[in-house]
């Protein structure tokens, strides 16, 4: 199995450190069942809605039954948002894609 990259090449060293601090905080919050209040504290309602939409975009892109334009119309998301999701999915490590497929598509009908 390929080792996953811990840092984001699109972020500065400082921003990567801040991101990893947040990820560690979230992991601790999950372990203590505090993840929902933490995310509500850290994210605005619009940001939480946007994350939910991004999950749906990734799910539908992986399902592969709708064009990006159809997906835009169904979800009410901008075409640029869907294109970014598509490009991110293409660049994702294979083990993440497999995990997402199991989490998002297994035992779900369209």
From Swiss-Prot:
GO cellular component, one term: cytoplasm
InterPro entries documented for this protein: Trp_repress, Trp_repress_bac, Trp_repressor/repl_initiator, TrpR-like_sf
SUPFAM superfamilies: TrpR-like (SSF48295)
Keyword Mitochondrion set for record: no
Subcellular location(s) per record: Cytoplasm
GO MF, any single term: DNA-binding transcription factor activity
Transmembrane regions: none
Pfam families the record matches: Trp_repressor
Main location: cytoplasm
Quaternary structure note: Homodimer.
NCBIfam families, per database record: TrpR (TIGR01321)
Family: Belongs to the TrpR family.
Known function: This protein is an aporepressor. When complexed with L-tryptophan it binds the operator region of the trp operon (5'-ACTAGT-'3') and prevents the initiation of transcription. The complex also regulates trp repressor biosynthesis by binding to its regulatory region.
Protein name: Trp operon repressor
Organism in which the protein naturally occurs: Yersinia enterocolitica serotype O:8 / biotype 1B (strain NCTC 13174 / 8081)
